[in-house]
Amino acid sequence: MKVTKETHFGIQRKIVANMTSESWETIPHISYIYEPEVSKFLDVVKELNASGKFPVKITVNTIMLKALAEAFKAAPCLNAHIEFNRKLVRGKISEFDEIHVSMTWILPNGEMMTLNLHDIGNKNLVELTEYIADVGRRIGNTDLNEVMFSVSMHDTIKKLKKGKIIQVLQRLIGSKTGKHKVRTLKGEEKKAYYSIPEHDRLTKKDIEQGTVTISNLGSIHRNQKGMCFLLEIIPPQVTAIAVNAIQKKPVVVYL
């Protein structure tokens, strides 16, 4: 067979591929599908925006995030990380008081990456809307390869501290040599980039692991038909939720 195109992984795809493969290798997945009738939900969204009580437009995505945050407060075991050592047969589950959501975001170039939306459980609808808008603003000032390389190096150091020396060496060889070398900023270009205040660009804190994953597929594929029924859980998280596109279809309504 003749190869028609060959694309080497950039750092973003390397990180996603690494986390996804680790997910399927280490986590037994199960899925549950709930398909609500959302006509009244959408009516509430319209009523909130027509009320004049909010200085900004409240989106379906914002209210969905707020609703899920309240659900995690009611079921804190889902907002957790798990650790398990198979060799020593030791493990623990750590529940968190704050809800940090790893959420897929569409970038200006059309690519997607996962960002960490911090502490959404303690934000009201206006604060959450303004926070999401600010994240979008900071993306425009961010060199994503640079910030993701920072996250990758931080994760590599953590693995080194855990004694995973061979894995660390393999990762360094893969990212620093040959055709697969990760390209980062150099010289004056790097100096100019890091002169941008951290509150005006994304940092490692905005990319690192959250406590739970939510992927709003409906905002990415608005004309989607069918649904996603299994989303990979990113370790050490224990929960991943996929929100599908709103679809018109006949349903049975129980009065």
Spans of features found by a protein language model:
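C-terminal catalytic/motor cores of large multi-domain enzyme assemblies
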Residues: 1-255
